[in-house]
Amino acid sequence: MSKLCYMKTIITLGMFCLVLGTLVAQPTMTWESPIDVSSEEFGNRCTRIALNQAGNPMVLHGKTGDNAGLYLSIMENGIFGDPIQIVSETNIYLFGESEGPRMAVYENRVAVSYQIFNEWATGGHVVISEDNGHTWGEPYAVAPTATEDHFMPHVAFNDDGLPWVALKLGVDPTEEGILHFNTDLDAFDPAISGSTATPGVCECCPSNAFGYEGMYYNVVRTNGDNLRDFWLTASPDGVNWDSAIDIDETDWVINACPASGTSSTVMEDGTLISAYMSASNGSRVYWSSVDLSTFTFLETGQIDPSNTFSENHPSISSSGAWLVAAWERNSDDYNVMVAASNAGPQALEMSVVNVTEGLSGNNRHPSVVYDGEHIHLAYQNAENGVVHYLKGEISGASQVEGVEIEENPWTISSNESGWILKGEDASYTLYDLGGRTLETGKFLNELHISNNNKALILQVRKNDQVNTFKLVK
């Protein structure tokens, strides 16, 4: 199924609707065989992948117990070198995959943020490499004299290549803390509040800090009376965080912390795409889109609306018009799913594939980066206690030429009771905005959709042609 063309219709006295059909094409991903990033001796906890300035994949992975530590494995000429232990500290918090260390890249600089276990106030650290991850300096404590919690640092770089950190500040209430690096002091400045415009902060959900065109951004799971939606916060200077918008229409209410965050990427047209898990209708993975130029929320949808299995831990990346998403799915065993689209996030569902099918054991916690030529995927292989790396390529496209309006086989109109679709016989699926399937079936000549005061997605399919209508009261 596909939601390639979303058309918003607004009822006043009537409804106005513009429709463009699309012919559906499915991109193909081809994969090399998985390889071990390192041996079991170096662990597979909290896996993250990024590319350094040379374009080489770097995989961050941690180990608890014997040989505990935080390691970076770098691929050069198709081979991963020996893991580099980036800090001497061994008591690193690696027990929550979503809450674990983070990695950021700026030119030849690579930064990793991490938390020392049981040192919730002073244990947040950032360590930096100046040579694409090969050697590492002394770590910086982000709040060495703090007396209140500074938990789960998420490091990012600003446009000048200086690190800054978003984290969870304090307990009951918890705020989003922002800390900037001060070059004069060679240390991080004290935390400032980055959540003044949000309805509370989810106390153990990781931050998602990043920069784009001089702006500072952070995607935060909020907590407003146990409504735990994701919000995008923004600041022009990293100090004044008075802009925030709700980017999550799933409206998940839960009275415990779900300990999950987002993965985000900015497309070539300035659209921010974020991927996240919500469990308002079972644990599923979703996408959300925002126009950063106008700071306007656009849409939310389920990555694979037809799926009925539990999903979690999405990762997303883009280059040019292409968007690549990876996540885990639990259908008896855990497997890693991947989807790609050059027609927006709505078309991801057309290419969903299980890339670990046939491998023994559970394969979980994927991290993906796409460089415009290759998909670089790292994930946790539980059976062997290692990180696997997969390299893939995309061929084909998610969308071919549009259908001219006069060739459109369906028209839609409205009245006080709902919507009326007329045209060629076809199958249809009705979704809510969270991607939940409400109704499926076939119709002959005419279909009536009742107005229940909720926004709906109507998808109509005949052979390879798909039209999708967004129906808004």
Describe each model-derived feature in a short phrase.
Residues 77, 424, 461-465:
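Short strand-coil-strand connectors
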Residues 421-428:
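Short proline/glycine-enriched turn/loop motifs at strand-loop junctions of beta-rich domains
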Residues 415-416, 437-453:
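Glycine-centered tight-turn motifs at strand-turn-strand junctions
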Residues 251, 392-418, 470:
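Residue-level detector of functionally pivotal "anchor" positions at catalytic/ligand-binding pockets or at interdomain
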Residues 430-438, 456:
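Short, glycine-anchored, charge-dense loop/turn motifs used at functional sites
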Residues 1-30, 397:
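Bacterial Sec-dependent N-terminal signal peptides
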Residues 454-473:
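C-terminal tail/sorting-segment detector
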Residues 26-396:
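Extracellular, repeat-based ectodomains that mediate carbohydrate processing or recognition
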